[in-house]
Amino acid sequence: MNKYDDNQIKELLMKPETQRKGFEMLVRQYSEQLYWQVRRIVLTHEDSNDVLQNTFIKAWNGLSSFHGDSKVLTWLSRIAINESLDFVRKQKNIAVVSADDSESSVANTLMADEYFDGDETEAQLQEAIASLPEVQRTVFTLRYYDEMKYSEMSKLLNTSEGSLKASYHIAVKKISEFFKSHD
């Protein structure tokens, strides 16, 4: 993977004549990292690729709104997380599933996904995460998997650090309770 300097990408994105090149660099630089952010929220490979593609389309169409005040990855992450959450909300509206069936369907979906390389414990963890309310799920995912600092999350999600810490603590507690009840 090529490593491009954030400032170099920003500079290219700011000039109409170099935007395309800057955007190509941006896609090469951040695709994998964004894919995993999306995948942890959306769960399946195919859906994650769709959401990632929508993320880059939105980013390209919204280049004029990017002024370079934040890091490129922060801007892209915000778009990716919003796209992921929108996708999950739409899926919830489509799928009318009882509460008992919803948990096992997450595990079944993951185990059937040819790109899922986890074991049953990982599938159960994903079930537990999927059962969390949206905000707690997002905060847990960003903190646990991406090891994102609360200060970064605060900027990304426009939420206070204290609120994020509380959401993470509650999410961890709920996940622990989930595993205790599924022993």
Explain the meaning of each model-derived region.
Residues 139-143:
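A short pre-motif secondary-structure segment
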Residues 1-33, 40, 181:
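N-terminal module of bacterial RNA polymerase sigma factors
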Residues 2-7, 94-118:
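Internal acidic/polar
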Residues 43, 56-71, 91:
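Sigma70-family region 2
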Residues 65-67, 78-98, 170:
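Arg/Lys-rich amphipathic alpha helix in sigma70-family domain 2
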Residues 50-57, 70-82:
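Structural recognition of an alpha-helix C-terminal capping motif at a helix-to-coil junction
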Residues 2-3, 95-98, 124, 152-158, ...:
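C-terminal edge and immediately downstream basic/flexible tail or linker adjoining helix-turn-helix-like DNA-binding
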Residues 27, 35, 45-62:
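Conserved RNAP core-binding helix
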